[in-house]
């Protein structure tokens, strides 16, 4: 995962680093790797890291709220199947705890809407065929925009 982040850093001029990065949650491995690499590479210039996960499997959200690893309770079924994690990875947790700025939980409908937008984009943009879990970050961005957060 860190190669992905390094490619982003290498391709962007220092004045064009992202201010915010939205990352799918799951058990937290991707989120931890992204957060850690931006932190190590950019220090205080690093972007805000926002983790996005499904409402029904919001283990990172609950863990951050309680400041300890928490299991997601109840039915973990979600349209975003690859993010249906019941518990944060104990390896990822210390990094998430110290380097993630925000965590948001979204409904399945947000992922469905994001898939539709990417498949049939406005303004004649190129379409993107993305899966249910892959659109979580985009759905998180749209969700924040709709709430004016």
What are these regions (language model features)?
Residues 1-149:
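PLP-dependent amino-acid enzyme catalytic core
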